[in-house]
UniProtKB/Swiss-Prot annotation:
Source organism (scientific name): Geobacillus kaustophilus (strain HTA426)
InterPro entries: UreE, UreE_C_dom, UreE_N, UreE_N_sf
Organism lineage string: Bacteria, Bacillati, Bacillota, Bacilli, Bacillales
Function text: Involved in urease metallocenter assembly. Binds nickel. Probably functions as a nickel donor during metallocenter assembly.
Pfam families, sorted: UreE_C, UreE_N
Any single Gene Ontology cellular-component annotation: cytoplasm
Predominant location: cytoplasm
SUPFAM superfamilies membership: Urease metallochaperone UreE, C-terminal domain (SSF69737), Urease metallochaperone UreE, N-terminal domain (SSF69287)
The protein's name: Urease accessory protein UreE
GO MF entries: nickel cation binding; unfolded protein binding
UniProt similarity note: Belongs to the UreE family.
Cysteine disulfide links: none
GO biological process: one example: protein-containing complex assembly
Length: 148
């Protein structure tokens, strides 16, 4: 089966069929328009999205009256950073930016993929954080550039 469009997301669709198969994906795979995946029931799918749209947790790839195939993002090893002041936020944002590390922001938290050097920096700067496994809503985007 070849999937070319995303039907919707389980958060916004009015109803779902009684049985759901899941395609477990790492967040890095959410940005790939063309890939081969296997559901938790062993069904092979080819994904070849016509639009340049990223996949997201809960996206419905296929559905009929009895079944749906849904994307489920695997939890990632993250540093969840909770600065307590604007100064702390500025310090850590500057340091993470200098390292060209992608970050995401959710409800007052900064999320970065686990890196022992960033963890050491957080400890040195006494910025509150915790390490945890968590699903992210979108892929971390690495934006490359060069310094001239």
């Amino acid at each position: 089966m070849i999937i070319e469009t995303i039907i919707g997301n389980i958060q916004t669709l009015p109803s779902l069929p009684p049985h759901i198969e899941r395609v477990y994906m790492a967040s890095d795979d959410l940005v790939k328009r063309i890939q081969r995946v296997v559901t938790d029931h062993g069904r092979e799918l080819g994904i070849r999205l016509k639009e340049a749209k990223e996949l997201a947790d809960g996206d419905v790839l296929w559905m009929d009256d009895h079944n749906a195939i849904v994307v489920s993002v695997l939890p990632e090893d993250l540093l969840v950073i909770k600065p307590v002041s604007l100064k702390q936020m500025g310090e850590i944002a500057h340091q993470i930016g200098n390292r060209h590390l992608p970050a995401q922001f959710e409800e007052g938290e900064m999320l970065v993929q686990y890196d022992y050097l960033v963890e050491e920096l957080l400890q040195q700067l006494a910025i509150p954080y915790k390490r945890e496994k968590r699903k992210v809503k979108q892929a971390f985007r690495h934006i490359g550039h060069r310094h001239d």
